[in-house]
Amino acid sequence: TKGPVADVTLDELPSIFPDYADVTIPPHIAPLRFRLSEPGDEAIAVLSCGNEKMITAASTDGQFLFPEKEWNKLLDKAIGKDIDVKVYRREKNEWQSYPTFLWHVSADPIDEYLVYRLIEPGYELWNKMGIYQRHITDYEQTPIIENSLTNHNCMNCHSFCRQDPEKMLFHMRAELPGTYIINGKSVEKLDTKAGEKVQSLVYPSW
């Protein structure tokens, strides 16, 4: 299976977002998605490693969404090697090809979960936030705690003890202020009150 026959070969790499050109990725990561800034009338990406190939057409707004099953098959083939990414775009009746860029697939695994606080950019809606975990192999996001359960207060600065998911702490402000320590199924609130004032802690470290 091949991509289109190009009428014109371009000199510059495609303008994509996020900029995934020539990066190293971990094995067994969820399919990378990117958008072609100028998709034209049609766009196609050809991913290949050795004899393993997959071809995906972009959506109308230029986004490439790679099927998970085919992606995982290609990724398994490419561990410790490179995936060649070739992007084509059609403008009217003319196919254009961009130079190939690479994704190097590391043989070294990384932790399967990321944890982060999710809040609107610019903090305009700080009263709607939460701390979430994302499984990097399938990109599923699940909440650890959302402030819809705590009167829409501010929560921040979560930290795990030596990357142990069973032991962490985070701070809350406004309603229910304080520092909370989770140890397995146990939750403890630290008493940080000095006199009549609750001292808000920041930037924890184990």
Question: Model regions: which residues?
Answer:
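Sequence signature of WD/YWTD-type beta-propeller architectures
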Residues: 1-206
